[in-house]
Protein backbone atom coordinates (compact mmCIF):
# COMPACT_ATOMS: atom_id res chain seq x y z
CA UNK A 1 0.00 0.00 0.00
CA UNK A 2 1.58 3.29 -1.10
CA UNK A 3 2.09 6.03 1.50
CA UNK A 4 2.19 9.82 1.40
CA UNK A 5 5.65 10.64 2.73
CA UNK A 6 7.45 13.92 3.41
CA UNK A 7 11.24 13.55 3.18
CA UNK A 8 12.46 16.40 5.37
CA UNK A 9 15.94 17.85 5.70
CA UNK A 10 17.18 18.42 9.26
CA UNK A 11 19.66 21.31 9.62
CA UNK A 12 18.24 24.48 8.15
CA UNK A 13 14.73 23.07 7.81
CA UNK A 14 13.61 21.38 11.03
CA UNK A 15 16.22 23.10 13.19
CA UNK A 16 18.56 26.00 12.62
CA UNK A 17 21.97 25.38 11.09
CA UNK A 18 24.83 27.04 13.03
CA UNK A 19 26.89 29.42 10.92
CA UNK A 20 30.18 28.81 12.75
CA UNK A 21 30.82 25.18 11.81
CA UNK A 22 27.43 24.02 10.40
CA UNK A 23 27.22 21.40 13.15
CA UNK A 24 24.58 21.04 15.87
CA UNK A 25 27.11 19.55 18.27
CA UNK A 26 25.84 20.95 21.58
CA UNK A 27 22.52 21.66 23.26
CA UNK A 28 22.95 25.41 23.09
CA UNK A 29 22.98 25.21 19.28
CA UNK A 30 19.67 23.36 19.08
CA UNK A 31 16.95 25.73 17.89
CA UNK A 32 13.70 24.61 16.29
CA UNK A 33 12.48 26.44 13.21
CA UNK A 34 9.46 28.69 13.63
CA UNK A 35 6.11 26.85 13.38
CA UNK A 36 7.77 23.52 12.55
CA UNK A 37 6.08 21.54 15.33
CA UNK A 38 2.57 22.91 14.80
CA UNK A 39 2.98 22.46 11.04
CA UNK A 40 4.00 18.82 11.32
CA UNK A 41 1.08 18.19 13.67
CA UNK A 42 -1.27 19.60 11.02
CA UNK A 43 0.33 17.60 8.21
CA UNK A 44 0.04 14.43 10.29
CA UNK A 45 -3.73 14.98 10.38
CA UNK A 46 -3.68 14.81 6.59
CA UNK A 47 -2.11 11.33 6.80
CA UNK A 48 1.42 12.34 5.85
CA UNK A 49 4.28 10.24 7.18
CA UNK A 50 7.69 11.78 7.91
CA UNK A 51 11.21 10.67 7.04
CA UNK A 52 14.23 12.73 8.06
CA UNK A 53 17.01 12.82 5.45
CA UNK A 54 20.21 14.63 6.38
CA UNK A 55 23.85 14.99 5.31
CA UNK A 56 26.12 15.28 8.36
CA UNK A 57 29.57 15.99 6.93
CA UNK A 58 32.31 14.01 8.64
CA UNK A 59 30.11 12.61 11.39
CA UNK A 60 32.21 10.35 13.60
CA UNK A 61 35.47 12.09 12.75
CA UNK A 62 37.74 14.05 15.09
CA UNK A 63 36.17 17.29 13.83
CA UNK A 64 32.64 16.04 14.44
CA UNK A 65 32.55 13.35 17.15
CA UNK A 66 29.47 11.13 17.19
CA UNK A 67 28.99 11.79 20.90
CA UNK A 68 28.68 15.53 20.28
CA UNK A 69 26.08 14.90 17.59
CA UNK A 70 23.87 12.25 19.14
CA UNK A 71 22.91 13.94 22.42
CA UNK A 72 21.22 17.06 20.93
CA UNK A 73 19.90 14.92 18.07
CA UNK A 74 18.14 12.49 20.41
CA UNK A 75 16.78 15.39 22.46
CA UNK A 76 15.33 16.86 19.25
CA UNK A 77 13.69 13.52 18.41
CA UNK A 78 12.25 13.32 21.93
CA UNK A 79 10.74 16.80 21.62
CA UNK A 80 9.04 15.83 18.36
CA UNK A 81 7.77 12.59 19.89
CA UNK A 82 6.36 14.46 22.89
CA UNK A 83 4.13 16.32 20.43
CA UNK A 84 3.02 13.18 18.61
CA UNK A 85 5.42 13.63 15.70
CA UNK A 86 7.12 10.38 14.73
CA UNK A 87 9.70 9.95 11.99
CA UNK A 88 9.34 6.63 10.20
CA UNK A 89 13.08 6.72 9.56
CA UNK A 90 16.02 8.99 10.27
CA UNK A 91 18.43 8.66 7.36
CA UNK A 92 21.91 10.08 7.91
CA UNK A 93 24.84 10.27 5.51
CA UNK A 94 28.04 10.79 7.56
CA UNK A 95 30.35 11.24 4.56
CA UNK A 96 31.94 14.38 3.19
CA UNK A 97 31.35 15.50 -0.38
CA UNK A 98 34.82 14.42 -1.50
CA UNK A 99 34.11 10.80 -0.54
CA UNK A 100 31.93 10.34 -3.62
CA UNK A 101 29.49 8.10 -1.72
CA UNK A 102 26.10 7.15 -3.14
CA UNK A 103 24.13 7.90 0.03
CA UNK A 104 24.84 11.63 0.23
CA UNK A 105 22.00 13.83 -0.98
CA UNK A 106 21.08 14.36 -3.78
CA UNK A 107 22.04 10.75 -4.56
CA UNK A 108 19.37 8.13 -3.98
CA UNK A 109 21.32 5.78 -1.73
CA UNK A 110 19.49 6.65 1.49
CA UNK A 111 16.00 6.64 -0.01
CA UNK A 112 16.27 3.93 -2.65
CA UNK A 113 14.17 1.43 -0.70
CA UNK A 114 11.27 3.90 -0.61
CA UNK A 115 11.13 3.81 -4.40
CA UNK A 116 10.53 0.05 -4.57
CA UNK A 117 7.30 -1.98 -4.62
CA UNK A 118 4.95 1.02 -4.78
CA UNK A 119 5.82 2.00 -1.20
CA UNK A 120 5.59 5.67 -2.12
CA UNK A 121 2.56 7.62 -3.28
CA UNK A 122 4.61 9.78 -5.63
CA UNK A 123 1.71 12.04 -6.54
CA UNK A 124 1.34 13.21 -2.94
CA UNK A 125 4.85 12.85 -1.49
CA UNK A 126 7.57 15.48 -1.52
CA UNK A 127 11.02 16.53 -0.33
CA UNK A 128 11.23 19.59 1.94
CA UNK A 129 14.59 21.26 2.41
CA UNK A 130 16.49 24.52 2.37
CA UNK A 131 19.17 23.65 -0.19
CA UNK A 132 19.30 23.14 -3.93
CA UNK A 133 20.49 19.59 -3.32
CA UNK A 134 17.15 18.83 -1.65
CA UNK A 135 15.32 19.94 -4.78
CA UNK A 136 17.63 17.80 -6.93
CA UNK A 137 16.89 14.85 -4.65
CA UNK A 138 13.16 15.42 -5.18
CA UNK A 139 13.69 15.45 -8.94
CA UNK A 140 15.76 12.27 -8.77
CA UNK A 141 12.97 10.58 -6.78
CA UNK A 142 10.30 11.76 -9.19
CA UNK A 143 8.35 13.68 -6.55
CA UNK A 144 7.59 17.28 -5.64
CA UNK A 145 10.24 19.45 -3.99
CA UNK A 146 9.41 22.40 -1.72
CA UNK A 147 12.22 24.80 -0.86
CA UNK A 148 12.19 25.97 2.75
CA UNK A 149 13.62 29.34 3.75
CA UNK A 150 12.17 32.48 5.22
CA UNK A 151 14.00 34.66 2.67
CA UNK A 152 14.21 32.77 -0.63
CA UNK A 153 11.83 29.91 0.07
CA UNK A 154 8.67 28.98 1.93
CA UNK A 155 7.90 29.24 5.63
CA UNK A 156 6.44 26.21 7.39
CA UNK A 157 3.04 27.89 7.28
CA UNK A 158 3.43 28.29 3.51
CA UNK A 159 4.34 24.62 3.19
CA UNK A 160 1.27 23.50 5.12
CA UNK A 161 -0.93 25.69 2.94
CA UNK A 162 0.57 24.26 -0.26
CA UNK A 163 0.17 20.66 0.87
CA UNK A 164 -3.38 21.01 2.18
CA UNK A 165 -5.12 23.77 0.20
CA UNK A 166 -6.13 21.42 -2.61
CA UNK A 167 -5.90 18.22 -0.69
CA UNK A 168 -6.92 15.46 -3.04
CA UNK A 169 -8.67 12.79 -1.02
CA UNK A 170 -7.30 9.80 -2.84
CA UNK A 171 -6.47 6.26 -1.82
CA UNK A 172 -5.42 3.00 -3.37
CA UNK A 173 -5.90 -0.39 -1.72
CA UNK A 174 -4.82 -3.75 -3.11
CA UNK A 175 -5.94 -7.13 -1.79
CA UNK A 176 -4.53 -10.35 -3.24
CA UNK A 177 -5.71 -13.77 -2.06
CA UNK A 178 -5.78 -17.26 -3.53
CA UNK A 179 -9.32 -16.50 -4.67
CA UNK A 180 -9.17 -12.93 -6.00
CA UNK A 181 -6.86 -10.08 -6.92
CA UNK A 182 -8.53 -6.73 -6.29
CA UNK A 183 -7.07 -3.26 -6.83
CA UNK A 184 -9.19 -0.18 -6.13
CA UNK A 185 -8.38 3.52 -6.32
CA UNK A 186 -10.84 6.22 -5.30
CA UNK A 187 -10.76 9.99 -5.73
CA UNK A 188 -13.39 11.57 -3.49
CA UNK A 189 -13.01 15.04 -5.01
CA UNK A 190 -12.87 14.10 -8.70
CA UNK A 191 -15.75 13.16 -10.93
CA UNK A 192 -15.98 11.09 -14.10
CA UNK A 193 -13.37 8.92 -15.75
CA UNK A 194 -14.12 5.84 -13.65
CA UNK A 195 -12.83 2.46 -14.83
CA UNK A 196 -14.54 -0.66 -13.49
CA UNK A 197 -13.82 -4.26 -14.49
CA UNK A 198 -14.72 -7.09 -12.13
CA UNK A 199 -15.47 -9.74 -14.73
CA UNK A 200 -19.18 -9.47 -13.84
CA UNK A 201 -21.14 -7.19 -16.16
CA UNK A 202 -24.06 -6.53 -13.83
CA UNK A 203 -21.73 -5.87 -10.89
CA UNK A 204 -19.72 -3.45 -13.04
CA UNK A 205 -22.94 -1.60 -13.86
CA UNK A 206 -23.95 -1.41 -10.19
CA UNK A 207 -20.55 -0.14 -9.05
CA UNK A 208 -20.74 2.52 -11.74
CA UNK A 209 -23.99 3.71 -10.16
CA UNK A 210 -22.09 4.36 -6.93
CA UNK A 211 -19.41 6.35 -8.79
CA UNK A 212 -21.90 8.39 -10.83
CA UNK A 213 -24.32 9.24 -8.03
CA UNK A 214 -21.68 9.93 -5.37
CA UNK A 215 -19.75 12.12 -7.85
CA UNK A 216 -16.46 10.36 -7.13
CA UNK A 217 -13.97 8.64 -9.41
CA UNK A 218 -13.22 4.96 -8.98
CA UNK A 219 -10.78 2.59 -10.64
CA UNK A 220 -11.74 -0.98 -9.81
CA UNK A 221 -9.84 -3.91 -11.31
CA UNK A 222 -10.64 -7.39 -10.08
CA UNK A 223 -9.88 -10.90 -11.27
CA UNK A 224 -10.81 -14.10 -9.51
CA UNK A 225 -12.64 -17.39 -9.41
CA UNK A 226 -15.86 -16.29 -11.12
CA UNK A 227 -15.71 -19.61 -12.96
CA UNK A 228 -16.90 -21.06 -9.63
CA UNK A 229 -19.36 -18.30 -8.69
CA UNK A 230 -19.41 -14.58 -7.92
CA UNK A 231 -19.17 -14.86 -4.13
CA UNK A 232 -15.49 -14.09 -3.57
CA UNK A 233 -15.35 -11.35 -6.20
CA UNK A 234 -18.37 -9.44 -4.87
CA UNK A 235 -17.27 -9.91 -1.27
CA UNK A 236 -13.66 -8.84 -1.79
CA UNK A 237 -14.56 -5.84 -3.94
CA UNK A 238 -16.87 -4.72 -1.12
CA UNK A 239 -14.06 -5.09 1.42
CA UNK A 240 -11.48 -3.25 -0.67
CA UNK A 241 -13.86 -0.47 -1.72
CA UNK A 242 -14.80 0.14 1.91
CA UNK A 243 -11.15 0.29 2.93
CA UNK A 244 -10.29 2.63 0.05
CA UNK A 245 -13.08 5.09 0.89
CA UNK A 246 -12.12 5.02 4.57
CA UNK A 247 -8.47 5.64 3.74
CA UNK A 248 -9.31 8.47 1.33
CA UNK A 249 -11.42 10.17 4.01
CA UNK A 250 -8.25 10.56 6.05
CA UNK A 251 -8.78 12.35 9.35
CA UNK A 252 -12.45 13.10 8.45
CA UNK A 253 -12.10 16.72 9.54
CA UNK A 254 -15.04 18.81 8.38
CA UNK A 255 -17.01 16.04 6.65
CA UNK A 256 -20.79 16.03 6.95
CA UNK A 257 -20.54 12.46 8.28
CA UNK A 258 -24.27 11.75 7.81
CA UNK A 259 -26.30 11.19 4.67
CA UNK A 260 -29.78 10.07 3.69
CA UNK A 261 -31.69 9.70 0.45
CA UNK A 262 -35.00 8.40 -0.85
CA UNK A 263 -35.09 8.27 -4.67
CA UNK A 264 -38.19 7.00 -6.45
CA UNK A 265 -38.62 5.15 -9.75
CA UNK A 266 -40.91 2.18 -10.15
CA UNK A 267 -38.78 0.96 -7.25
CA UNK A 268 -38.20 2.98 -4.11
CA UNK A 269 -35.18 2.75 -1.86
CA UNK A 270 -33.86 4.59 1.13
CA UNK A 271 -30.42 4.78 2.65
CA UNK A 272 -29.17 6.14 5.96
CA UNK A 273 -25.41 6.46 6.39
CA UNK A 274 -23.26 7.47 9.34
CA UNK A 275 -19.48 7.41 8.92
CA UNK A 276 -19.29 6.60 12.58
CA UNK A 277 -16.33 4.29 13.02
CA UNK A 278 -18.82 1.66 14.21
CA UNK A 279 -19.63 -0.92 11.50
CA UNK A 280 -23.25 -2.01 11.26
CA UNK A 281 -25.65 -2.97 8.48
CA UNK A 282 -29.42 -3.12 8.47
CA UNK A 283 -30.58 -4.39 5.10
CA UNK A 284 -34.07 -5.13 3.85
CA UNK A 285 -34.66 -6.08 0.26
CA UNK A 286 -36.07 -9.17 -1.41
CA UNK A 287 -35.51 -10.45 -4.93
CA UNK A 288 -37.64 -12.90 -6.90
CA UNK A 289 -34.82 -14.44 -8.87
CA UNK A 290 -31.53 -16.08 -7.89
CA UNK A 291 -29.60 -14.13 -10.51
CA UNK A 292 -29.95 -10.60 -11.84
CA UNK A 293 -27.90 -10.67 -15.00
CA UNK A 294 -24.71 -12.48 -14.01
CA UNK A 295 -24.85 -11.38 -10.36
CA UNK A 296 -26.28 -13.50 -7.55
CA UNK A 297 -29.11 -11.68 -5.80
CA UNK A 298 -28.03 -13.15 -2.45
CA UNK A 299 -24.67 -11.35 -2.82
CA UNK A 300 -26.25 -7.88 -2.79
CA UNK A 301 -26.64 -7.85 0.97
CA UNK A 302 -23.22 -9.45 1.38
CA UNK A 303 -21.58 -6.73 -0.73
CA UNK A 304 -22.99 -3.93 1.41
CA UNK A 305 -22.12 -5.81 4.59
CA UNK A 306 -18.51 -6.23 3.43
CA UNK A 307 -18.32 -2.57 2.44
CA UNK A 308 -19.90 -1.25 5.66
CA UNK A 309 -17.59 -3.25 7.92
CA UNK A 310 -14.46 -2.33 5.95
CA UNK A 311 -15.50 1.33 5.81
CA UNK A 312 -16.46 1.25 9.51
CA UNK A 313 -19.79 2.92 8.87
CA UNK A 314 -23.36 2.45 10.03
CA UNK A 315 -25.53 1.70 7.00
CA UNK A 316 -29.30 1.18 6.67
CA UNK A 317 -30.65 0.13 3.26
CA UNK A 318 -34.11 -0.80 2.08
CA UNK A 319 -35.73 -1.22 -1.32
CA UNK A 320 -39.25 -1.98 -2.51
CA UNK A 321 -40.62 -2.61 -5.98
CA UNK A 322 -41.58 -5.16 -8.59
CA UNK A 323 -38.66 -5.46 -11.00
CA UNK A 324 -35.51 -7.11 -9.59
CA UNK A 325 -33.16 -5.13 -11.84
CA UNK A 326 -34.70 -1.82 -10.80
CA UNK A 327 -34.66 -2.73 -7.11
CA UNK A 328 -31.02 -3.73 -7.34
CA UNK A 329 -30.04 -0.60 -9.22
CA UNK A 330 -31.97 1.64 -6.85
CA UNK A 331 -29.96 0.29 -3.89
CA UNK A 332 -26.64 1.19 -5.49
CA UNK A 333 -27.96 4.56 -6.67
CA UNK A 334 -29.30 5.51 -3.25
CA UNK A 335 -26.07 4.48 -1.56
CA UNK A 336 -24.12 6.65 -4.01
CA UNK A 337 -26.35 9.66 -3.37
CA UNK A 338 -26.06 9.18 0.38
CA UNK A 339 -22.29 8.76 0.24
CA UNK A 340 -22.05 12.02 -1.72
CA UNK A 341 -23.73 13.90 1.14
CA UNK A 342 -21.70 12.29 3.89
CA UNK A 343 -18.21 12.88 2.43
CA UNK A 344 -18.70 16.56 1.61
CA UNK A 345 -16.32 18.79 3.58
CA UNK A 346 -18.41 21.62 5.01
CA UNK A 347 -16.42 22.56 8.11
CA UNK A 348 -13.03 22.33 9.77
CA UNK A 349 -13.66 20.23 12.85
CA UNK A 350 -14.27 16.55 13.45
CA UNK A 351 -18.07 16.02 13.51
CA UNK A 352 -18.09 14.13 16.79
CA UNK A 353 -18.65 15.19 20.40
CA UNK A 354 -16.31 12.35 21.39
CA UNK A 355 -13.49 13.75 19.29
CA UNK A 356 -13.08 10.41 17.53
CA UNK A 357 -14.61 8.72 14.49
Swiss-Prot record:
Region annotated Imidazoleglycerol-phosphate dehydratase, chain positions: 169-357
Top-rank taxon: Bacteria
EC number(s) reported in the record: 3.1.3.15, 4.2.1.19
Gene Ontology, cellular component aspect: cytoplasm
Pathway(s) the chain acts in: Amino-acid biosynthesis; L-histidine biosynthesis; L-histidine from 5-phospho-alpha-D-ribose 1-diphosphate: step 6/9; Amino-acid biosynthesis; L-histidine biosynthesis; L-histidine from 5-phospho-alpha-D-ribose 1-diphosphate: step 8/9
Active site (record annotation): 9 (nucleophile), 11 (proton donor)
Compartments, as annotated in UniProt: Cytoplasm
Binding site for Zn(2+): 93, 95, 101, 103
Cofactor(s), by name: Mg(2+); Zn(2+)
Catalytic activity: D-erythro-1-(imidazol-4-yl)glycerol 3-phosphate = 3-(imidazol-4-yl)-2-oxopropyl phosphate + H2O; L-histidinol phosphate + H2O = L-histidinol + phosphate
Annotated binding of Mg(2+), by residue: 9, 11, 130
Gene Ontology MF terms: histidinol-phosphatase activity; imidazoleglycerol-phosphate dehydratase activity; metal ion binding
Entries under PROSITE patterns matching the protein: IGP_DEHYDRATASE_1, IGP_DEHYDRATASE_2
Region annotation Histidinol-phosphatase: where it falls in the sequence: 1-168
A GO BP entry: L-histidine biosynthetic process
Protein keywords: Amino-acid biosynthesis, Cytoplasm, Histidine biosynthesis, Hydrolase, Lyase, Magnesium, Metal-binding, Multifunctional enzyme, Zinc
Family: In the N-terminal section; belongs to the histidinol-phosphatase family.
Name under which the protein is recorded: Histidine biosynthesis bifunctional protein HisB
Organism: Buchnera aphidicola subsp. Baizongia pistaciae (strain Bp)
Gene name for this UniProt entry: hisB
Amino acid sequence: MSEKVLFIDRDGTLISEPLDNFQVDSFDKLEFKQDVISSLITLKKFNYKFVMVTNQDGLGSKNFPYKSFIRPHEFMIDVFLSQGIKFEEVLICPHELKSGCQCRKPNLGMVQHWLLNDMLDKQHSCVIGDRKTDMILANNMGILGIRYGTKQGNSWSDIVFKLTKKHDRHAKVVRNTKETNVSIEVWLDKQGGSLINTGLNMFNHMLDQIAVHSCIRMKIISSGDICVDDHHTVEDVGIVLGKAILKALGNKLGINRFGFALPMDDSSSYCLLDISGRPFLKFRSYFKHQYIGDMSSEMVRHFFQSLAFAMKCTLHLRSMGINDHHRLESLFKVFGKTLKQAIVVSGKNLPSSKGLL
